[in-house]
Amino acid sequence: MAKANVSPGMQQYLDIKKNYPDAFLLFRMGDFYELFYEDAVKAAQILEIGLTSRNKNADNPIPMAGVPYHSVQQYIDVLIDLGHKVAIAEQMEDPKQAVGVVKREVVQVITPGTAVDSSRPDSPNNFLVAVDFDGKAYGLSYMDVSTGEFFATDLADFASVKSEIQNLKAREVLLGFELSEEEQAILVKQMNLLLSFETTALEDSPLIDHQLTAVELSAAGKLLHYVHQTQLRELSHLQTLVHYDIKDYLQMSYATKSSLDLLENARTGKKHGSLYWLLDETKTAMGMRLLRAWIDRPLVTSEAILERQEIIQVFLNAFIERTDLSDSLKGVYDIERLSSRVSFGKANPKDLLQLGHTLAKVPYIKAVLEAFNSPYLDKLVNQIDTLPELEHLIRSAIDPDAPATINEGNIIRTGFDERLDHYRKVMREGTGWIADIETKERQASGISNLKIDYNKKDGYYFHVTNSNLGMVPDHFFRKATLKNSERYGTAELAKIEGQMLEAREESSSLEYDIFMRIRAQVETYIDRLQQLAKALATVDVLQSLAVVAEKNHYVRPLFNQESRIAIDNGRHAVVEKVLGVQEYIPNSISFGPQTSIQLITGPNMSGKSTYMRQLALTVIMAQIGSFVAAESASLPLFDAIFTRIGAADDLISGQSTFMVEMMEANHAIKRATPHSLILFDELGRGTATYDGMALAQSIIEYIHDRVGAKTMFATHYHELTELSTKLTKLVNVHVATLEKDGNVTFLHKIAEGPADKSYGIHVARIAGLPEDLLARADAVLTKLEAQSQARESVLSTTEVRETQQLANQQLSLFTDDGSSSEIIKRLESVDVMNLTPIQAMTVLYELKKLL
């Protein structure tokens, strides 16, 4: 990016910029961060800031835009949110002391995956992901730079990689291998990711356990290298890498989590109306993030779940202590992110005060937990390190009224440093000392109007008018002569002035140095602070789940090994919260050990989808350790949940509703086990009726015969209810309705057996369609039903007659060309009683080829 005829300062800019071609370079110049050339033009448009130029009178003025240093973060946030990278070039020396061009260096590169600063205290994790491939398996590693969390796993296929990236809600992915343009497009366009290619791995890091697989090590090493290259400093808050296996958690795709509104409402994109919203009674930012993590990754082992349940039960049994605990957690700040600010060298006095305030509360929180007197809490109590020495350091060192910046002074508490106290005394009492000198010299000299003034050139001086020059004492020395007066100094005044100037200059730098030393001391406690943060976050989530359980009258679920689901008067926890307890109608759910499929029929808007989601949310709540919305519940432990609820075209990739349905159905039947839960709502509706019914039946049979997963299958194909006569593990249920005087009431209650009507026109009436249109629909429906019955009657008679005729005919009636015998053999081999629709279509196609 060489430019001709540029100044030394601009050449410095160009030299730095060439190393960061893919980032906006914010170049510190005095009180502004400036952008030049293409960066300025783009930034002016994106940030809506003024675009000007440097050297306006030159033949080719340099485009320039700038933002004030004190508000730069808000502009950085905008660029990062739009998926850009930002490089920060700071002045590395005092411009007043610099010889020639001020030395500047890039001190940090901020990217979507490494952004730390946020104006939202409750902001979720921001994960940076790295992926590598060794030809057989994929290694995936991710980190939240703002908290230091660091994880890695290995995955069998790229579909699993994409699913994990979606579940992490990553904004930036590092690739250590070549990826096809098609797959890159999926990541960039469909998943809105910033892709970077990283080929260098950081080796021999103490953060990485070398027991990992080689591909995991490679992904983790490349992620660490990228973080070091962008943050340009050692980060003491980064935690030791933790290996995980996705099979250790209840597996759910991003689409499943979205359809169940786990972390946000899929329709609004907001927290309100989600399971996270329902369960969130946390008091700390750390607790909020951990609750999201628990909802995102429910457990699959009963021991860990029961441990959480026991603590929730302890909290429920002691209302006063639990209320005290909740109140004490309210004043706890975000220890994880405060620690990261210390590690980044960005912690200001207010940050340390927040940390100190939090540590001051910890002994009381620990005492409250001990007051529960429960062995189930012993592990958590032992993890709570009160760090009294760190709390004492911050309390004794940092002034409680300290400003948020480190260069304004008034940071260090009086009494912490003797030298600083002396300087402050000089500054505080110096003006009094000068007033005393003025009074003393006025009285001694007899000059009644003698006074001391100050300016930057002469400093402090005695002001003597010409009429009093004869009375000037001998120990006065002249500093300046004016037209009507002269300025004098004395040794005593010079001494006081020197002390005051020294105090003013030295106290500022001394206070800065003291603060830096304190911050460095705090940094040595980061490991212990992070362990404390984890313990407090766990306490916070468990008390939150206890509060929610008590408020909403939830019960403790039991787990069984008989593959049995028994939920008595269960509720969809989120819908109940939105509607209110009085309006919600509960439903029991029962799957015996030998029942694998519930076929659900009933009209639209009757509650089929809510009933299905109710089971899924009950399972998820139970497996995060929460109590559940029911009068009682006994469940098996599930290993995965697969859903297809709600229809939506994939507009970006051009896939129709039907294609998405089939892909999700394929994903479920291939990956589900007998310990999985499958929820299919109206599968097959995206194609022609008979195609859809054939596929729906085939999928039901496949799940019944080969998969064995607990399945809820809601359908409008009433013909499928006949499957219960031949599929022994399938039962029919329907949503009950009440029909009286032409009016239909949906009871939202699940009953045994199939539905007898769909009530589609009634739903249309509720939707407000014109009455004349609905009357026409009723007439058409009556006619179609009559035609259908007549057609079925004729078909039945014809089939009987043709069968009898065929029995009396001789084989010689067929042309003897050889194909007839093949057709007969093929027909004889067909098991008509067990033929599925899709298999029948296949046989018909084969027979047609033989003709």
Curated annotation (Swiss-Prot):
One of its GO terms (cellular component) is cytosol. ATP binds at G602, P603, N604, M605, S606, G607, K608, S609. InterPro entries: DNA_mismatch_repair_MutS (IPR005748), DNA_mismatch_repair_MutS-lik_N (IPR007695), DNA_mismatch_repair_MutS/MSH (IPR017261), DNA_mismatch_repair_MutS_C (IPR000432), DNA_mismatch_repair_MutS_clamp (IPR007861), DNA_mismatch_repair_MutS_core (IPR007696), DNA_mismatch_repair_MutS_N (IPR016151), DNA_mismatch_repair_MutS_sf (IPR036187). It comes from the Bacteria. The keyword DNA damage applies. GO terms for molecular function: ATP binding; ATP-dependent DNA damage sensor activity; damaged DNA binding; mismatched DNA binding. GO terms for biological process: mismatch repair. Keywords: ATP-binding, DNA damage, DNA repair, DNA-binding, Nucleotide-binding. Belongs to the DNA mismatch repair MutS family. This protein is involved in the repair of mismatches in DNA. It is possible that it carries out the mismatch recognition step. This protein has a weak ATPase activity. This is DNA mismatch repair protein MutS. The lineage of its organism: Bacteria, Bacillati, Bacillota, Bacilli, Lactobacillales.
